[in-house]
């Protein structure tokens, strides 16, 4: 049986919010079977819990923000991407502020935290959402689509008319049966344009952004001394974001996601569209791990 997974131990980290610039304390805790991923604002009294579900997404400007009764938790996508990539079904995420810390701008530090905490299998079957037919949403020239696929695959293309990005691969196809999320995707950092950063700061956004957590690009070049981690780090980061956004379905996916210039808003619109079309998907479990189109590393090795 492919089993549900949680963490073995509690683990903590500290960082800053990308947009708020505030110091944030993050704690990841094991959670019982069928809990899902639940974010908790421990700085509030009483503590506010917000399940990481598509219907709880309230804002998608520059990051994915969960909202419940006016309480917000911003920038959840990189942590969710790490949880999805390692197949963690159940986890409590405690935060001391309204934003998940940005760490280095990728999902890498969260992968490290989860692996350091250890992964525990639970005595219940892991539930997958299997795509049964195509579902598409569009917004002008942006597009996001689910199609049936026996496994998990992400196809993504971006279209930036910028000398730095134009000269690199702007399209990628990643089949996770043969490609490691941890090695090939998790370390891709968020990127921003120098000309936009001033505007964002004027709006009280990107206050925690720096060369330590963003690939900064001016009109001609990458400003970070160490350059890029992957040749196609820009489009790979969009894949990382999409995997985090898709995990708001609450389960791992069996299917293919295709995105063209899609961002957090369109990704969420696609999830809501899929969930509303009950004949387009089904929940499946696997008694025999050998029959599953998706496999996960054994926890000892993960």
Curated annotation (Swiss-Prot):
Cofactor requirement: Zn(2+)
Gene3D superfamilies the UniProt entry points to: lpxc deacetylase, domain 1, lpxc deacetylase, domain 2
Enzyme Commission (EC) number: 3.5.1.108
Catalytic residues (UniProt): 264 (proton donor)
The keyword Hydrolase is annotated on this UniProt entry: yes
Reactions catalysed: a UDP-3-O-[(3R)-3-hydroxyacyl]-N-acetyl-alpha-D-glucosamine + H2O = a UDP-3-O-[(3R)-3-hydroxyacyl]-alpha-D-glucosamine + acetate
GO-annotated molecular function: metal ion binding; UDP-3-O-acyl-N-acetylglucosamine deacetylase activity
Swiss-Prot/TrEMBL keywords: Hydrolase, Lipid A biosynthesis, Lipid biosynthesis, Lipid metabolism, Metal-binding, Zinc
Lipid metabolism is among the record's keywords: yes
Pfam families linked to this entry: LpxC
One GO cellular component term noted in the UniProt record for this chain: membrane
Pathway it works in: Glycolipid biosynthesis; lipid IV(A) biosynthesis; lipid IV(A) from (3R)-3-hydroxytetradecanoyl-[acyl-carrier-protein] and UDP-N-acetyl-alpha-D-glucosamine: step 2/6
One Gene Ontology term from the biological process aspect of the record: lipid A biosynthetic process
Protein family (similarity comment): Belongs to the LpxC family.
Function: Catalyzes the hydrolysis of UDP-3-O-myristoyl-N-acetylglucosamine to form UDP-3-O-myristoylglucosamine and acetate, the committed step in lipid A biosynthesis.
Protein's name in the database: UDP-3-O-acyl-N-acetylglucosamine deacetylase
UniProt source species: Hahella chejuensis (strain KCTC 2396)
Lineage per the UniProt record: Bacteria, Pseudomonadati, Pseudomonadota, Gammaproteobacteria, Oceanospirillales
């Amino acid at each position: 049986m492919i089993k549900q997974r949680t963490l073995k131990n509690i683990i903590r980290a500290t960082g800053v919010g990308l947009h708020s610039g505030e110091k944030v304390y993050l704690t990841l805790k094991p959670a019982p079977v069928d809990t899902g991923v639940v974010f908790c604002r421990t700085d509030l009294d009483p503590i506010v819990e917000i399940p990481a579900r598509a219907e709880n997404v309230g804002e998608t400007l520059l990051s994915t923000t969960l909202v419940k009764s006016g309480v917000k938790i911003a920038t959840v996508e990189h942590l969710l991407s790490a949880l999805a990539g390692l197949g963690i079904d159940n986890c409590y995420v405690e935060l001391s502020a309204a934003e998940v810390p940005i760490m280095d701008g990728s999902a890498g530090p969260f992968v490290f935290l989860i692996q350091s905490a250890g992964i525990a299998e639970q005595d219940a079957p892991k539930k997958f959402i299997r795509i049964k037919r195509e579902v598409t949403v569009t917004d002008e020239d942006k597009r996001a689509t689910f199609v049936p696929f026996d496994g998990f695959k992400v196809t993504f293309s971006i279209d930036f008319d910028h000398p730095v990005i134009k000269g690199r691969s702007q399209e990628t196809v990643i089949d996770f049966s043969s490609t490691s999320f941890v090695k090939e995707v998790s370390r891709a950092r968020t990127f921003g344009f120098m000309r936009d950063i001033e505007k964002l700061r004027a709006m009280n956004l990107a206050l925690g952004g720096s060369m330590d957590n963003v690939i900064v690009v001016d009109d001609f070049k990458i400003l970070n001394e160490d350059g890029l981690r992957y040749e196609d780090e820009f489009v790979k980061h969009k894949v990382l974001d999409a995997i985090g956004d898709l995990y708001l379905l609450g389960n791992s996916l069996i299917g293919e996601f295709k995105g063209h210039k899609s961002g957090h808003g369109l990704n969420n619109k696609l999830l809501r569209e899929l969930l509303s079309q009950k004949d387009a998907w089904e929940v499946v479990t696997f008694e025999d791990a050998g029959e599953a189109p998706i496999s996960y590393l054994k926890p000892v090795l993960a």
